[in-house]
Amino acid sequence: MSRVPSPPPPAEMSSGPVAESWCYTQIKVVKFSYMWTINNFSFCREEMGEVIKSSTFSSGANDKLKWCLRVNPKGLDEESKDYLSLYLLLVSCPKSEVRAKFKFSILNAKGEETKAMESQRAYRFVQGKDWGFKKFIRRDFLLDEANGLLPDDKLTLFCEVSVVQDSVNISGQNTMNMVKVPECRLADELGGLWENSRFTDCCLCVAGQEFQAHKAILAARSPVFSAMFEHEMEESKKNRVEIKDVEPDVFKEMMCFIYTGKASNLDKMADDLLAAADKYALERLKVMCEEALCSNLSVENAAEILILADLHSADQLKTQAVDFINYHASDVMETSGWKSMVVSHPHLVAEAYRSLASAQCPFLGPPRKRLKQS
């Protein structure tokens, strides 16, 4: 059994991208040859379809595939009666089928290959099946002594066979590109600074509770905090900020977002968090709250959400709320929230009516647009 060659190192294979792992597939092909000499060829019977077979042969003593060559000296049928037909026959096979390519040639008086013909692909052989050439060589050309193909009236045929065996996969890792860059943990690490109150330089007071924070991070994330610390304001001088109109739990969630960009409890307090995000100019958090509120729009809360969106200039949420009210107009107008809005925010009622009147066709369903996050 021939040894499967090892794949070339990845760096030698190409100058293109280098994969972290690779697989090299070797399709094993067993090649062997066979020579068959027919003495006194001119005495072969000249009936069309007459068959001469060689003895059986194989690639080696342990190969259970047995082959033979088959010649029709005067062709196989009427179409090929002026030709010699030559075929490779699979005599015995332990498998259901094999695939093989073959090449036939004639050896002249000098032992040189001439008149070679070969298969263009690997053919499927089953036991008893043959493949070859019905018109391998013209009889008149073969029998013409001037061509030197029958020295001493001997026809010598040379056959090369390539049998396709099983494929072998070799896989491995590219040792040239094994550097693994760890995932960025910046959000977790900054979150740790907030949770553990390490290296803080300012105090935030919320409803009597004090929270230690970092001015640089607050200023980088919020234009409002940045203005407090940048100018000669009381907060900057005392490193102490009074946070008003924000509940402690909402404040904690806002601070978590400032440090990590995440707000795991957003769905539970989206309305209050929207107000805090608006107050401290946290635009991405604001849109995240809009998206959460939009997904929870209902007939009962549509009017309240519209008021909230208008109060905090949440334009995307406001558009979604108006569209929802238009689609469910008859039901929404029966709710206490709508009736209260008629009294407290008549301009929003007017906006909703204008939108409803300008609609060119009824909505096919409640809006489900995904909000854009800045």
Curated annotation (Swiss-Prot):
Signal peptide: none annotated. One of its GO terms (molecular function) is ubiquitin protein ligase binding. Residues 71-191 are annotated as: Required for nuclear localization. Residues 31-161 form the MATH domain. Homodimer. Part of cullin-RING-based BCR (BTB-CUL3-RBX1) E3 ubiquitin-protein ligase complexes that contain CUL3 and SPOP, plus a target protein. It is found in: Nucleus; Nucleus speckle. The lineage of its organism: Eukaryota, Metazoa, Chordata, Craniata, Vertebrata. One of its GO terms (biological process) is protein ubiquitination. Belongs to the Tdpoz family. This is Speckle-type POZ protein A. Keywords: Nucleus, Ubl conjugation pathway. Pathway: Protein modification; protein ubiquitination. Gene3D superfamilies: 6.10.250.3030, 6.20.250.50, Apoptosis, Tumor Necrosis Factor Receptor Associated Protein 2, Chain A (2.60.210.10), Potassium Channel Kv1.1, Chain A (3.30.710.10). Residues 173-297 form the BTB domain. GO terms for cellular component: Cul3-RING ubiquitin ligase complex; cytoplasm; nuclear speck; nucleus. The BTB (POZ) domain mediates dimerization and interaction with CUL3. The MATH domain mediates interaction with protein-ubiquitin ligase substrates.
